[in-house]
Amino acid sequence: MKCPKILAALLGCAVLAGVPAMPAHAAINSMSLGASYDAQQANITFRVYSSQATRIVLYLYSAGYGVQESATYTLSPAGSGVWAVTVPVSSIKAAGITGAVYYGYRAWGPNWPYASNWGKGSQAGFVSDVDANGDRFNPNKLLLDPYAQEVSQDPLNPSNQNGNVFASGASYRTTDSGIYAPKGVVLVPSTQSTGTKPTRAQKDDVIYEVHVRGFTEQDTSIPAQYRGTYYGAGLKASYLASLGVTAVEFLPVQETQNDANDVVPNSDANQNYWGYMTENYFSPDRRYAYNKAAGGPTAEFQAMVQAFHNAGIKVYMDVVYNHTAEGGTWTSSDPTTATIYSWRGLDNTTYYELTSGNQYFYDNTGIGANFNTYNTVAQNLIVDSLAYWANTMGVDGFRFDLASVLGNSCLNGAYTASAPNCPNGGYNFDAADSNVAINRILREFTVRPAAGGSGLDLFAEPWAIGGNSYQLGGFPQGWSEWNGLFRDSLRQAQNELGSMTIYVTQDANDFSGSSNLFQSSGRSPWNSINFIDVHDGMTLKDVYSCNGANNSQAWPYGPSDGGTSTNYSWDQGMSAGTGAAVDQRRAARTGMAFEMLSAGTPLMQGGDEYLRTLQCNNNAYNLDSSANWLTYSWTTDQSNFYTFAQRLIAFRKAHPALRPSSWYSGSQLTWYQPSGAVADSNYWNNTSNYAIAYAINGPSLGDSNSIYVAYNGWSSSVTFTLPAPPSGTQWYRVTDTCDWNDGASTFVAPGSETLIGGAGTTYGQCGQSLLLLISK
């Protein structure tokens, strides 16, 4: 997640380098918030929440941008902080709105009470931009309904790149945002099916992370008008099925600030590609729709989901409930100036976590303001939007960006050391607190059972910024976690030999599911989401082809600011003249094999199957360019790697011994020294040992074959002595990732394995490579 530098002023962000699952709650969206037609489509009811407003007026428009309102209606309090009004469709048509209905709100409150002489662009009634309670009402700022199901356009777009119109403060408070502001779109319920959801157990999944636009934007096999869209992505379902992928995880698709991406062609100006700047939690991003008419993005997204479901593929979404695109105050010295176009103008104290004095925002996200995730109403919005995406849009699971913020047990005003649930100030992760958002989500939704069935798959990015926010292994039962330690230790083992101490015990722990992180909380190996690379960092190829990041290069591969300096990457000696491209491919094969042969749920980044490169850029959040878009015209080496990846995934899927539902125990898994002796404490404790092997007793895990894996972390060859295979069988080679085996048949098809031998057979394994054998 990254704050685009071009949006820093608009968003007020800094550019910075055990609870059991319960049945779904009956009261999801119990306040019936949003805009909805009645059964006869004769009336539209508008309902919005604000605990502090003293007046709210509905503004209706015939278009989403550039026009004045056609009608206004004053809402009335409906109890429990809800404001409502019902408008006859006949009245809306009489006002000149005969097509889609666009709408927004203007709100008054304690810091800006209503004055009868107020008019758009007026300061009548103004008291302060922010009061002692933290209220930030400003009737000159049209407000997007947090429950809108579609959004007309982004605040910044080809017709408006001026973020000042949405700002408060002395210079901007009277600037009226009405014609520029994003507006909600009233939708007639869609009849588009999302198909039948797969019920596959998560342990059997292979996840493919990809950007919905980048997936097809330069795929020439797809008609031009569908490239980069939900429709186009749905056309790739067969591609993923052929690769062996069982779940596609899309980078954020909720409405985000990206309409200005194309304003300056062939430039990173105005760009926000990844999409971690959510403007609304219910709306599918309109930019990614081929059909951009009202209701088009919703139906098109649903049709895409149906296409994946028809192919047996789950659909996951990356969701960003830790902050919003409104950001924080524009500077740390002026509390009055902040962006207002939705949550902040309706109920700042409900939706954001305020610092002591209520003038600024507490921030563990790098974007300027924590979403107030310990607040019940803010949690309602999270739960309601998740339910909408799961039930109406057909989504099968969610990856939560900076999920540690959803474990925050602090509320506004609880900032002293004596506050019982905030010992560290304005942020405290507390998985034992039943009221934090991560536990509320577990109560509201059914998590998919271990053996499969209906329910959601939940994935946490288990860290944020500051405090006790690094929580890898700290989430409660029901949550799976992105295992950053798996990524780091694997990269270190392959790329840092001689530069840092490498622990073969960590490699063994990674191979077997990371029990040190997940077992004590009652979780299983598959709760570890194992990855080498994802969007946030280098690609698989670059991990093994780059000596650090290069983010300052020219378009289309840069420039990008930020990015970590801790990459654990290495070009395999290419720049030093001791390595070659074949060595880089060997390292990439070894890394991917390590991932796919490990217990846990593997996650790969889109394009890794053909060695996609970003030319060492490790933070390409701002590049809506050909560098970030997948390509399907490959070299011979890329095609060979695709075949390797495809067969490797198929092997994983064919062998249940690699996908255990519980931790390996007893004779199910045996670790060996290269000599063939069982690894003992002396071997494990010797940090000079960089080679290890293991055998999985397949029949004890429902597998027809036993499996032997040898990993040589040394730079030179090591001889492994093979243990005894099951009685009546011998060991056969499936793959050896060494350079000699580079080509189209690095990973052989089933039935084409090469006989190696039985107990006591020796095998010379080249440096920094992996050997895979099966018994038969």
Swiss-Prot record:
Signal peptide: 1-26
Superkingdom per UniProt: Bacteria
SMART domains documented for this protein: Aamy (SM00642)
Disulfide bonds: C410-C422, C546-C616, C738-C766
Triggers of expression: By maltose.
Keywords: Calcium, Disulfide bond, Glycosidase, Hydrolase, Metal-binding, Signal
Organism: Pseudomonas sp. (strain SMP1)
UniProt subunit comment: Monomer.
Family: Belongs to the glycosyl hydrolase 13 family.
Catalytic activity line of the entry: Hydrolysis of (1->6)-alpha-D-glucosidic branch linkages in glycogen, amylopectin and their beta-limit dextrins
Keyword Signal: yes
Taxonomic classification: Bacteria, Pseudomonadati, Pseudomonadota
Name used for this protein in its record: Isoamylase
Entry-linked CDD domains: AmyAc_Glg_debranch (cd11326), E_set_GDE_Isoamylase_N (cd02856)
Site (Transition state stabilizer): D536
Required cofactor(s): Ca(2+)
Cofactor note: Binds 1 Ca(2+) ion per subunit.
Record-linked Gene3D superfamilies: Glycosidases, Golgi alpha-mannosidase II, Immunoglobulins
EC identifiers of the protein: 3.2.1.68
One family name in Pfam for this protein: CBM_48
Active-site residues per Swiss-Prot or TrEMBL entry: D401, E461
GO molecular function: isoamylase activity; metal ion binding
Biological processes, Gene Ontology terms: carbohydrate metabolic process
Annotated gene: iam
Amino-acid positions noted as binding Ca(2+) in the UniProt annotation, renumbered to this chain: D154, E255, T256, N258, D285
